[in-house]
């Protein structure tokens, strides 16, 4: 009772302080002695006085915000510890709806006004090249350019180089795909190991030779198989600059579908490996093969301390435009950056491909003659019918003149007299003969050039960084700085076309089953990293490290590398051969199973009340997994908890850094179930049947759904007992609409069930925030009405089907070449609809032949109840050349603008361009897409990367799956015929703009609201339910685990807490990498009564007091991938992040 009084008093105190503070503010502004009334005339001095008053008012608001924040923390502390009365139970009203009483705990939504300034933008200079504007202004015509088909004729004056020689760097390279036509291991065995073995011997033959490598995954495998002498030689070659490892990631990742967690993780894995084994730190980025480029990647490379980068696969019309305006080299800047802290120097290759015919100059017929692997007698030749000729004394002058002409023409497209000429292709240099042919012939050409000053050319072999260093030197700037006159660019390079209207927008969806599995593995990896790091730190602090399975670190390392491998631009993209896809799938599943073990082991240790009782037994795990997959291409099957006379315990893991109020659904073997909290309080639950089809329930399996509050990054405990509590075990009611179909229906005495043979009337589901209408005919969503609004918002959902062209060029794994607009999906039979209603959730499932569409509405306060949970179970294995799309039609006046995320890191505005074909207007959607007008925003959140567009105002359209019977002539040699039953998961969030908050139309940036960010996190990081194994008696106690002393500010995301490897072997060190991301957010969307706790702190976090029961004994800010310390370690553990920034810290917990 005493605690309850304290809570009441503190709650009242907040109100009083707020009112009193506002009174003081107004009072101080009103009675200012310097203020005079001027009858409406405001001289300049008065305006400045007014500005001062406004600034003072802002300062006072800020102070007020801080006071309330402090009081809020006190109240939350009190309420968290309060053993209040049991919560009121849900009840059923006369009008047929469930009411869940409000929670006794207060919720806070307290955002500092200063934190709202960032999204308003308007600071800093605009870049010369904004890609959204470039795309709007370009004609995208495809005029024949002569020998450079997609470009133009290039001419020059031979005297252009009289004042300054042309400096040419020829960069030998071999592009090794970690899986595409062959599996990773097969490529390694048959080609890659031979390339790297030859590299060591051939580079040592002549110190003038150079070689560029990118994929650390292959390099690490090779390293494990070579002897000490060869390793020493490799270190020497790296040390003297003959061998450069560019980018240094585990793979060269896809930039469309990959999530930024995985992009960073594979970069860290590569960089850490290079530092440990070679002492190498990458300086330049090399991305010749990803199919379009995200602006997230330059940000990550810059924060990893790289100074330059190169890209290749950009739309041919953009390449031509940039070549014509000498803009192929630019400083790439983030759209939100108000100065130049995110700038990185970027080189865009000008021609069609990264192969030799398209890299020496504009004429592939001539360049092919200088690819000496194609000398007569070899296995490949020149398609232009003029073969290369070996360079001799007799022909060197003529051959050199021909090549120099190409070099000079290519250099006319750039601003400096330093020229980059890559020399390589896929899996090149795999035989010693090729090394000899290329290096000997080119060296003869270089010797000829360099011995004739009248030619004004200096040519040599080089690495990528050799080229960039020479360019910086020529332009007189420090490495990475902006050379005078070079443009600044912001935006991204999607979508990509390599010729005609062949847009590479199909791979945004291709093989969605594995795109989904990728994200499941990612969420498990992050969860396992965090729990493992916390468990190891707590075990060390308690002196129990010897008992804890620290060897799980090898499982973590393998999973990091599996996730990294799958970010490769032929893996997550869905563009590999079927056997290679199976290989990836098997790897993904193996790592997923291993990560579940890591999570179980860590949760077991952390949830024990008495750590001394901890005993690790791999043969008899303390916890069970939440679900299992029978094979890599099967959907998960949830664990059924067997109830009997003794209670069963379940440990719940919340991977979010925010406290979470969520619905947890468990499967049990009886409808007679009681659920108790950790303290033994009985909880209200909703019990439902578990369905195997539209009308058939699984016998002896029931779903029990219970709302639970879980600590940030923490563990909660539930107890399940056999028995019935009529007040708290609340059954769902079910209606099944058969639409005239003759089907048998499972019935159960525990659940009221009504069968409706032919009803077609629309019906609604509702919760405390909204009423949602569905079509009685289709079972699909029709409209949403928020409870505080009179009018409903049209949100009309449809299923559509795309065909492919009848002409020669058809859609395939890469390309989307539809036969026109999509047509409505016409089912053979009307759908069966199953409507479930209950106290905590209601849902509608529409069963069609090719898609089961479920929409669920949670009747909970906070994030869970503010959006619709949507899942689409898709099976198109009987389709021929068709693609299935989900279409949402609204009356939002979006004016041709829509927004898609880039890698889950940032949002990029898009404009529907009528001048381009339909397929050009599709973009990647890794986590969200939205449309908006002055009043509303509708966001579709996704748990897997898919392709999205808005083809008309007020519409969003997502491609769910594609089945294509033919190759699209990009080297794969297969169609997409290995479709799986795939579950795509979404959240649909409707938000209203607050009065007076403008939509930032003219801006090149846009930001989700805080609610939207949290909704995405809930979808992508679900709570895990881990039952305590039956044979394990929990003994004296399982206790919830609260790792954080206080929640992080709600604009902060703890991206990872990653245990670092020890120097000597595969064991963990005592250090972890803490990676934080401060998100940019839009304050202009409704933020009242949201029912969840959220405060911001102007970017400040006290890391020293963040972890409960652990001290931060060492803290070192570093570059993104930990290769560079950014400041000396200090005693202060307070850190500050600007919005949108990601920061990495090396820390030791003890």
Swiss-Prot record:
Glycans are attached at residues 95, 305, 1093, 1131. It is a single-pass type II membrane protein. It comes from the Eukaryota. Gene3D superfamilies: Glycoside hydrolase 38, N terminal domain (3.20.110.10), Glycoside hydrolase family 38, central domain (1.20.1270.50), Golgi alpha-mannosidase II (2.60.40.1180), Golgi alpha-mannosidase II, domain 4 (2.70.98.30). Zn(2+) binds at residues 175, 177, 289, 569. Homodimer; disulfide-linked. Interacts with MGAT4D. This is Alpha-mannosidase 2x.
């Amino acid at each position: 009772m005493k605690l309850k009084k304290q809570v009441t008093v503190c709650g009242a105190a907040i109100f009083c302080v707020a009112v009193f503070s506002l009174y003081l503010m107004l009072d101080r502004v009103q009675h200012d002695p310097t203020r005079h009334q001027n009858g409406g005339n405001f001289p300049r001095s008065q305006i400045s006085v007014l500005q001062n008053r406004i600034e003072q008012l802002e300062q006072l608001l800020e102070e007020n915000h801080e006071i309330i924040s402090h009081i809020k923390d006190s109240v939350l502390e009190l309420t968290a510890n309060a053993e209040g009365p049991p919560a009121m139970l849900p009840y059923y009203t006369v009008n047929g709806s469930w009411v869940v009483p409000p929670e006794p705990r207060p919720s806070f939504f307290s955002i500092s006004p200063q934190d709202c300034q960032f999204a308003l933008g308007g600071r800093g200079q605009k870049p010369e090249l904004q890609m959204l504007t470039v795309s709007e202004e370009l004609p995208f015509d495809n005029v024949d350019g002569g020998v450079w088909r997609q470009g133009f004729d290039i001419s020059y004056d031979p005297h252009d180089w009289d004042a300054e020689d042309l400096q040419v760097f020829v960069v030998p390279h071999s592009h090794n795909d970690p899986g595409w036509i062959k599996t990773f291991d097969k490529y390694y065995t048959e080609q890659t190991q031979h390339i790297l073995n030859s590299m060591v011997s051939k580079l040592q033959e002549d110190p003038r030779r150079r070689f560029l490598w990118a994929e650390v995954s292959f390099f690490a495998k090779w390293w494990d198989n070579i002897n000490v002498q060869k390793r020493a030689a490799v270190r020497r070659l790296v040390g003297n600059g003959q061998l450069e490892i560019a980018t240094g990631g585990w793979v060269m990742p896809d930039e469309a579908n990959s999530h930024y967690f995985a992009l960073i993780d594979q970069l860290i894995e590569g960089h850490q490996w290079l530092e440990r084994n070679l002492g190498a730190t990458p300086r330049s980025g090399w991305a010749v093969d990803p199919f379009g480029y995200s602006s997230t990647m330059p940000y990550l490379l810059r924060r990893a301390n790289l100074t330059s980068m190169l890209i290749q696969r950009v739309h041919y019309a953009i390449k031509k435009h940039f070549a014509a305006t000498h803009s192929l080299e630019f400083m790439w800047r983030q759209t939100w950056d108000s100065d130049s802290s995110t700038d990185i120097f970027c080189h865009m290759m000008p021609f069609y491909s990264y192969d030799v015919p398209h890299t020496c100059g504009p004429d592939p017929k001539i360049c092919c003659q200088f690819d000496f692997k194609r000398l007569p007698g070899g296995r490949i030749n020149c398609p232009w019918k003029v073969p290369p000729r070996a360079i001799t004394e007799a022909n060197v002058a003529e051959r050199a003149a021909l090549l120099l002409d190409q070099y000079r023409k290519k250099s006319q497209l750039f601003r400096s007299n330093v020229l980059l000429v890559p020399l390589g292709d896929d899996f090149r240099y795999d035989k010693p003969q090729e090394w000899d042919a290329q290096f000997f012939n080119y060296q003869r050409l270089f010797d000829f050039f360099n011995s004739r000053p009248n030619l004004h050319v200096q040519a040599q072999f080089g690495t990528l960084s050799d080229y960039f260093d020479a360019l910086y030197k020529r332009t007189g700037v420090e490495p990475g700085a902006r050379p005078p006159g070079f443009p600044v660019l912001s935006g991204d390079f999607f979508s990509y076309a390599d010729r005609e209207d062949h847009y590479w927008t199909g791979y945004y969806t291709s093989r969605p089953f594995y795109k989904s599995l990728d994200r499941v593995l990612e969420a498990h990896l992050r969860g396992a990293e965090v729990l493992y790091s916390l468990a190891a730190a707590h075990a060390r602090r308690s002196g129990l490290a010897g008992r804890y399975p620290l060897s799980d670190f090898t499982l973590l390392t393998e999973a990091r590398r599996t996730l990294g491998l799958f970010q490769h631009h032929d893996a997550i993209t869905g563009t590999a051969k079927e056997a290679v896809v199976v290989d990836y799938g098997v790897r993904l599943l193996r790592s997923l199973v291993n990560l579940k073990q890591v999570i179980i082991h860590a949760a077991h240790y952390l949830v024990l009340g008495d750590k001394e009782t901890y005993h690790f037994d791999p043969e008899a795990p303390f916890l069970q997994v939440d679900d299992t997959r029978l094979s890599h291409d099967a959907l998960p099957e949830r664990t059924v908890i067997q109830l009997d006379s003794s209670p069963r315990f379940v440990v719940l893991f919340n991977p979010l850094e925010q406290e979470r109020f969520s619905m947890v659904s468990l499967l049990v073997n009886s409808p007679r179930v009681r659920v108790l909290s950790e303290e033994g309080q009985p909880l209200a639950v909703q019990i439902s049947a578990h369905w195997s089809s539209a009308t058939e329930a699984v016998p002896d399996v029931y779903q029990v759904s219970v709302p639970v509050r879980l600590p940030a990054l923490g563990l909660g405990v539930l107890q399940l007992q056999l028995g019935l509590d009529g007040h708290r075990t609340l059954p769902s009611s079910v209606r099944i609409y058969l639409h005239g179909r003759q089907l048998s229906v499972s019935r159960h005495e525990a659940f009221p069930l009504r069968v409706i043979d032919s009803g077609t009337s629309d019906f609604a589901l509702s919760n405390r925030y909204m009423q949602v209408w569905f079509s009685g005919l289709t079972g699909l969503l029709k409209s949403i009405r928020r409870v505080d609004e009179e009018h409903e918002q049209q949100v009309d959902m449809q299923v559509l089907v795309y065909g492919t062209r009848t002409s020669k060029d058809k859609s395939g794994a890469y390309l989307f070449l539809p036969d026109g607009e999509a047509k409505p999906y016409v089912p053979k039979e009307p759908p069966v609809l199953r409507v479930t209603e209950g106290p905590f959730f209601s849902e509608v499932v529409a069963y069609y032949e090719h898609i089961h569409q479920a929409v669920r509405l949670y009747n909970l306060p906070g994030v869970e109840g503010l959006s619709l949970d949507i899942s689409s179970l898709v099976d198109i294995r009987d389709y021929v050349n068709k693609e299935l799309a989900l279409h949402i039609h609204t009356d939002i006046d979006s004016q041709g603008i829509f927004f898609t995320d880039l890698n889950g890191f940032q949002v990029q505005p898009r404009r529907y361009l009528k001048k381009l074909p339909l397929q050009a207007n599709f973009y990647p959607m890794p986590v969200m897409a939205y449309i908006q007008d002055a009043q509303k925003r509708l966001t579709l959140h996704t748990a897997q990367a898919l392709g999205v567009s808005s083809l008309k105002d007020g519409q969003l359209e997502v491609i769910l799956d594609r089945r294509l019977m033919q190759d699209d002539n990009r080297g794969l040699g297969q169609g997409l015929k290995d479709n799986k039953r795939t579950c795509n998961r979404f959240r649909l969030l409707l938000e209203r703009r607050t009065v007076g908050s403008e939509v930032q139309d003219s801006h090149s940036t846009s930001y989700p609201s805080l609610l939207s960010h949290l909704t995405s996190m809930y979808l992508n990081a679900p709570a895990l339910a881990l039952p305590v194994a039956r044979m394990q008696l929990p003994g004296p106690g399982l206790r919830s685990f609260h790792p954080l002393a206080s929640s992080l500010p709600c604009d902060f995301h703890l991206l990872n807490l990653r245990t670092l490897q020890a120097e000597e072997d595969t064991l963990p060190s005592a250090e972890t990498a803490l990676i934080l991301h401060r998100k940019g957010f839009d304050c202009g969307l409704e933020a009242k009564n949201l029912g969840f706790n959220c405060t911001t702190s102007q970017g400040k976090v006290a890391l020293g007091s963040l972890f409960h029961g652990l001290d931060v004994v060492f803290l070192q800010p570093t570059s993104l991938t930990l290769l560079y310390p950014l400041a000396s370690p200090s005693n202060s553990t307070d850190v500050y992040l600007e919005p949108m920034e990601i920061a990495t810290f090396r820390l030791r917990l003890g």
